Amino acid sequence: MLFISITAALLLAVLDTLPAGGVRAQDAEGWYKAHPGMARISQVNQDTHQIVDEFGRTRFFHGTNVVMKEPPWYRPFEWAPGVSSFGEQDVQNLHALGLNIVRLGHSWAGAEPVRGQYNQTLLDIMKKQTKLAEEYGLYVLVDVHQDVLARQFCGHGVPDVSRMRGPVGTAATDMAVQWFVKEDWVPGWKMYPFPLKLTPFPVDNKGFPSPQSLCGTVDWSLSYTSAAVCNAFGRLYNNYDGLGDAFAAYWKKLASEYVETTNVVGYNLLNEPWVGDSMADPTLLVPGVADHKVLEGLWNRAAKQIRTVDNDTLIWFEGATIDILSGFNNVPLGDGSTSVHSFHYYSPPQLSSISTTLNNRRKDNERLRTAGVLTELTFWMGDDQQMQGLADAMSATDANMVSWIGWAYENLYNGTSGQPYPELAKHYSRAYPAAVAGTPNSFSFDENSGTFKLQFTSDPNIKAPTEIILPPSTFPNGYKVQVSPAGSLLQYGPNKRTLALFTSSSIKNTINISVTVSPR
């Protein structure tokens, strides 16, 4: 067994002792100088069901969600306590926590206020925030977010008002044209939120419930069962009035904006899509049915448009909102090597433990020959039971080698002090392997002892290093590293939070390697 301090590691990083021939330089610093940017990620290993980067390393992600659900549809750049922002201070904070991914909401409502005309100003702002994330080592998952689809339903997601009718100074000036949700789609008595309430909400000239406070009288998650919401989702999936085509065209626009962006790890097609018009077809409520019956068609429609401008970026797809069982027959366009199953865990609607859910998702990955990532889970302050559930989720994702993205960034902070809640920060600041130069067999982090363990099978053809994220807040006094077999890995510290481990050039065949990192 080999015990080496991080100080000694900086020296050993450039030395590789061979059985014969003395010492040969293995220039870790030179490798990082030759590869100064973030590694491009655009492939899934269909045998291991894990995401891999351009160097062949298996990649893991810990991160958070950043989504703006109302105008102006993006988080402000300026940092202020109690304000949900996403600027330089925020990405610095996320980097310091040890995170390496952000699921960044790209509102369709904000991006296409007039049908067929895109708000380039908003898209440029989103690209600026994506670039800012790259400067601090954060990947971005481009996410088209929705909750209950539209503001006409007390939600958000699809475009609502495209323009005002009539000349200025006339009554018609205040009439809005709605290019997605139309008032005549359902009879007046079935308008939102029927049947949650027997009397539909009054609406303003834009078709939004008025006063807005009415929205608080209905459980938003139950709004998916309202007649108007079901009808609208059904029309999207059936491509009524070309709405499915418009959705796909928006994705083509986004892909054309990001095709050359190194830190974009994928395109998340739509957040938590509802099953469709379950009032017209009740079988859609059976877990798994909507996935193959209505969602596969929309995902293929969008994926085809994406691939006209971007052949490489991973396409992330979700199952229906209830997300209990996966019912997909195939991944978008049938290529699991360029697709990722994006799934969530909340209880309810999940009925089983997080461990059972992750095991079921593993079976989905094997069946669909793709990878899966937990892109939302409960990551906010709560009672003892909820906090224990979060701790259990952290252990379970490690045990199943699953990447995760918590919901949501703004929940991390105390709104009064602007300081992170320690109970949440400790989970965000876990040690984990961001990149593994081979096939990972297991990894774990014990928050009580601060000990991280990794076992993997090396791949001597991969010259890039294994990278372990060790947040300074978790290891304030440094750390010690134990490697077996001795001499199999050479250490280097490219930055304050990363331990790089280069496989020794003396190793010509695959071997099993174990790494243990513990605090000083």
Task: Label every model-predicted segment.
Residues D47-F61, V66-L314, G319-G327:
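Active-site mouth of glycoside hydrolases
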Residues T17, G22, A28, T510-I513:
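Short linear motifs in intrinsically disordered/low-complexity regions
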Residues M1-R24:
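Fungal secretory targeting signals
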Residues G37, F55-T58, D90, N238-S256, ...:
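Substrate-binding clefts and catalytic carboxylate motifs of secreted carbohydrate-active enzymes
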Residues T516-S518:
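Beta-strand-rich extracellular modules
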Residues A25-R57:
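N-terminal module-boundary/linker segments of secreted carbohydrate-active enzymes
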Residues A20, D27, G37, D160, ...:
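Generic low-complexity segments that are intrinsically disordered, proline-rich and/or Lys/Arg-biased
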